[in-house]
């Protein structure tokens, strides 16, 4: 089918796609059109990576936005929503869709700040957002949601994910219930039960294994590649590793390689080794460009991880994992797409939709550690096939190859049976679990989706879980447990079968925190206000909501919790991923707990209780935040806690979000600790001590420049407004444009830097950096 023959598209759209080189539709795309995707039909497209799923979504969205019957135009009020699983994908997709601005359409993107209603998005024709953001928009009453004409769910097979799957599942169920005549288009990898997904969404199904270029899969063993069609190709290993040999073989054919490993450490170690291979394949021009990229990488953060990544990139290799800063990952992805970086060693996060195809994919590690199982477990077929799907770049590669590595003949046969010849597993709903249901049940009640228990069960009947089971007993049982929990903690009230969210429950839903997180925070704030560190039953956990009326707060309750106490409080919530305790940490942090016991909020478990280790893990996480807020260098924090810059920033962002929730909840409880919580939040947000809060909040200043300015005598925003320009220029290390922007922000009467000399005393090499004072005491400096 030619794109010009697609029905339902306004004039000029077909010409646009033809100008982009799309004249003939791929078979799955043509089948989607035949099944009515441009005429309002719901559709599930279960097709391999790089087989044109995005174009199916674009055709659906553009036709849904348009109005006018046989001669459609973009003059209607419809809005298309594109849901992505990752923040990184949101920006990438929004950039793709900006090509449609030529038709007068506007594109918006939203991924953060879950408490806002997204009113600014109302004027957009296409909105790109994560499922969590869409869920929060519904909770906060975003009016434009009612104007949706089409919603696209990318990577919908991720409903199978324990953590994020329930949110995507419930969000789609909410949208279908809230918005009349909403078209739903779900894009999925090839899965074992695409028909069930289609039945859930009342959708047409396109289920295809077609790819635009050939994908050859196989296993390397000994000195040969064994392919799925029974053929073999010689690939000698020699004295090196299998991975290095496969990468070298790919380079000899001017191809690039993605290597998937099972841990961050393995990704970094693999990249270091592969740099010796890729470095020999670089031209002088490539070396120059890679040197510039390496310099950019070093500028992202002052950490060993940043330096190691830069060293690898300079030689044409890289690693990619969640411990990297966002800027690191973007630089690596762009350099790989530009064919400057020849090999990337990555954890499976890179297979989750980010557009980084390669000539050859190597799945080096097909097992990873599973803490629940207590050992190494094989990866799912679906996950490995997602990695396979990254092989082959349409328009750039004549074919793609995906290779597993075997160390024995038995393993060779096992890998063929387990992955090469196997079909992917069916996706299964993960909704019927109490942690998944807590937040969604509260939100359904708080937003008025349901006002009775029967109504709640009817709403949940629109989920994938309900489609996949004939036995609703488990879901009803777990839902009953959740309702009792929400009632006991004061988030909902039950009057017979009637359900109503309390004011606190309404707030918790809008804040988008797990109700258990909110209960933990509330208990801690109430405990602080009572100045109590023990419960009646020593060592037992009892929520404040269970203590009875005699434990009510005094009318003038006032408390000043410390930053460490607040950081520990939010680190104990299920919304925070705690740091693991390493060997020797238990004794060390037990000592810290005794030293700071008066600061720590809420009940403390006894040392012999199972909960004690999690409690200590939260204390370790809190100490990281306290070090950050005390201006300790990022490099020292990374070394002390064995984390990457991305981990630090992730913990900081989560802490800021949870402390904002704590501040709002303190106001709801009339506990007058709002200023203390706000200060702790601001300090962790900017990574500074109290005296720098005013300066660090100025755009383009940040923690290090704020400390330099303060040490040079510029101690406040008012001081900065009238500061000596040479001092400001020195504090930003001679960057005139940056100095001008800072002075313009604060309203300096003459921000220009022409002829201004930098005051070198304002930029000392040591002692003036954030955390640069090596004599500075820190919470982490204990024996």
UniProtKB/Swiss-Prot annotation:
Sections of the chain in a coiled coil: none
Main EC class the enzyme belongs to: isomerase
EC code: 5.6.2.4
Reactions mediated catalytically: Couples ATP hydrolysis with the unwinding of duplex DNA by translocating in the 3'-5' direction; ATP + H2O = ADP + phosphate + H(+)
GO molecular function annotation: 3'-5' DNA helicase activity; ATP binding; ATP hydrolysis activity; DNA binding
Keyword Isomerase in record: yes
Binding residues annotated for ATP, in chain numbering: 29, 47-54
Span of domain Helicase ATP-binding: 34-209
Record keywords, A-Z: ATP-binding, DNA damage, DNA repair, DNA-binding, Helicase, Hydrolase, Isomerase, Nucleotide-binding
Motif, DEAH box: chain positions: 154-157
Residue span, Helicase C-terminal domain: 242-443
Organism domain of life: Archaea
Record note on quaternary structure: Monomer.
Entries under HAMAP family matching the protein: Helicase_Hel308
Family the entry assigns: Belongs to the helicase family. Hel308 subfamily.
Function summary: DNA-dependent ATPase and 3'-5' DNA helicase that may be involved in repair of stalled replication forks.
Protein name: ATP-dependent DNA helicase Hel308
Organism: Halobacterium salinarum (strain ATCC 700922 / JCM 11081 / NRC-1)
